[in-house]
């Protein structure tokens, strides 16, 4: 192979190092799930290919900047990665730590690839590469922001544009997640400003528009961590300019600081009113307080996960094992998320996973980035657009937003790439050839080929498994057999996707198949979900999520299928052991006894014994979790069914003051109890919440009309009946007694 081919590889190598900057723009619908998956597969693939080409070029005698490795700052990423591997080997599950999950895209493999990119850029880049990469990042960030703004506009107008990713909740652009989007743009915004600094002509206008769109996109995500971080960075920039600036810029900055103080005072003075403004970013920021549900949930998670982390301060728990601690400390009365694998604080995440040394190295990485940016600052005249100042603000924004959210692979890759480039700009060394003599083509080609083979287990097979999972998902209701064929093919590939296959199997069965399918289709769906979750139950014995999901699938088995109660109890016992305050496993444990009671004749004495077994389970849970109304209303209903009105009232009276916000899980048993005892006033409250949650459920609306009438408010009942006459008039004929009564009331008003 001649020099010409080596030159071609060298040129391709330069493009490969820039290629990850384009990944945030990649969006594929209907092929893989979630959005981040295709980006991660491409990142892994690009990293492996770039590594293979580097080895080929290095062994072929191609010169690189090896002297840069003498810079002590350059070894921080390697040290952090080494600590991550060490703590994961001694952690809970190295296999899961290495691969992670589709839905997150993190893990040791991702960290390894990002670290490889850091060193490849460090050994290769020059100032021209820095400029090219910065322009690519600026253009891509501008396009991602454009998609986000268009999403927001179409959502406000109530439309849908075919080429835009669908919006579910807050806008997420091509990331499909508002926090991912805001975290990326919060860092990329300063790269856009850096490129804008020297841009001229049309490009200058383009980057000005990209800057504006990025700010709006971040605002529209309503991600408070990033918004607050940017506001703090803006204040720092204004203080700097008011101190170091000259002429009009200095004067403008001082006025800006005065305006910021005034706006801040007005904001805090009218915070309660601003919290009602129909604009989500302002609402979310104005609602920040210790009593805010999200804030109190975060603080609870930080405190309790931090306490668990202090039990293993040196070794940590290993990468991607935060979910185990989350499950352990989970309290449904305190935490919003059902399942989560992050603490919403990147610094705490590093401490939990990698121990104190991992946290210190992460802080050292941020500090080294800042130190390198400040060295760059000294190379340019002072001013707001000084590159060193911009990159200092970038890393400060990154650190501040990560205190409130979690890091993402794309933000981390960008920070690593820029860190390498800052080291490059601080001191440029002459190229040096690889210290070994130039190897034969066979050696360099063989080594590169071996590295490329890693693409098969790391990218090709997991990607194919993801595609098969997506294909099956698209068919899981309309053609269960075909869907199961795709799922089984995906599982036979033997990839790390098996855990996620189990999660998706549960979601498909519990959310759709169990309620929409019947007969053999439902049985087939159940058997698949049960089999994959059972396999994962054995393979991942520490996973409370798998145990809970398997228990729920067994609890909702088709009536034609016999369930092994002993196995279900074993499954639910494990779920309770690993997440003792999670309600679902306790309820399902009680359901085992209730199913046995329902299988007996009404006059069978054994029914009471099974009812009391269920009551014992729920009372044990109610004692552990004193703030939930659901188990108490369920106990009230069970005691009432046993004829013990005194105990029923005791539990209902305990439950009622705990019902502070609408909760459909609690409203159901509450309505049953209050209807049974004829307490119409209390029943109205819960039925009203159920109607507000699902206004199209006219059966519930009709129940509300009847109970409202019985509660002594026939006027309100009449208004509800008028709505039903317009929406579903036939429903009124189902209760002739009420129809006669409300008709008589209407006629009495004439």
Would you name each region that the model predicts?
Residues 46-53, 191, 229-237, 362-365, ...:
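Transmembrane alpha-helices of multi-pass inner-membrane enzymes
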Residues 146, 152-155, 218-222, 226, ...:
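A membrane-periplasm/extracellular boundary helix in multi-pass inner-membrane enzymes
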Residues 177, 290-292, 297-340, 347, ...:
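TM-adjacent membrane-interface loops and short helices in multi-pass inner/ER membrane proteins
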